[in-house]
Design a protein with these regions (language model features):
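Alpha-helical scaffold segments in soluble metabolic enzymes
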Residues: 24, 28, 91, 115, ...
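Short acidic, glycine/serine/threonine-rich loops at helix termini
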Residues: 26-30, 88-89, 111-114, 138-143, ...
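N-terminal, positively charged nucleic-acid-binding surface of large information/translation enzymes
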Residues: 51-56, 60, 65-66, 116, ...
């Protein structure tokens, strides 16, 4: 197969506390980027595949999904957000080119967020910050942004990491904006920012094909599948 395609491909990990809207955001990013056919039936919470994950609404095993936008491909990795799955977190971060930090506009930064973010910063990733659930009545987006900056400082983020881009969003309603009171139309501003901010790793296309494996799973129709 033509793996030497000129399409730019980058790997993005999404960091979020439980119930901060990560899986719903991924659902709408995929829908708005045109990842599905018009007549395709799409379940909610696409990235929650295991029974326990669907029941509790948490991510235990990292799972990838790809979206195409502006002649680029972004491989989104739904990353565990709990320190109990530290090995899985480190495995994912080691293969990521960038990170998206998703924070609830009312709850703000949580301990589990700090745990994963610390590892991402140590890995040298430069996160995009998205203040999510801005449609909440008790949202306090400006305070949460200040808390987030303080968290970056406390984790010894470098100057580039401290100069993080910020968007305000509602994953459930499917919009993102550069301002708290900005247009609430769609997630295109977030998709554009991901393409602009996350730089793909440099590849030597003269070398033989090599792939970092992300997931091995069984399918009743296709059999064993390896994704990377």
């Amino acid at each position: 197969s033509d793996w030497s395609s000129d399409v730019c491909s980058s790997d993005l990990t999404i960091i979020a506390h439980v119930d901060h809207g990560k899986t719903t955001m991924i659902d709408n990013l995929m829908k708005q980027s045109g990842s599905f056919r018009e007549n395709e039936v799409v379940d909610e919470r696409l990235m929650d595949s295991g029974e326990l994950e669907k029941e509790r609404g948490i991510t235990i095993l990292a799972k990838p999904a790809s979206i195409n936008w502006q002649d680029s491909r972004v491989n989104i990795i739904d990353t565990p957000g709990h320190r109990d799955f530290a090995a899985e977190v480190e495995r994912v971060l080691s293969m990521a080119d960038g990170a998206l930090l998703l924070i609830d506009s009312a709850e703000g930064v949580m301990p589990q967020t700090k745990f994963v973010l610390a590892k991402a910063l140590k890995q040298g990733l430069k996160p995009i910050v998205v203040i999510n659930k801005l449609d909440k009545a008790d949202q306090r987006a400006n305070e949460v942004l200040d808390e987030t900056f303080d968290l970056f400082v406390s984790l010894d983020a470098n100057e580039e990491q401290l100069d993080f881009p910020v968007l305000y969003a509602s994953g459930r309603s499917g919009w993102a904006s550069k301002e708290v009171d900005g247009p609430r139309e769609n997630l295109h501003p977030l998709l554009d920012l991901i393409i602009e901010h996350v730089q793909p790793a440099e590849l030597d296309k003269t070398k033989p094909f090599a792939m970092l494996s992300t997931l091995l799973y069984a399918d009743s129709f296709l059999g064993r599948n390896l994704v990377g």
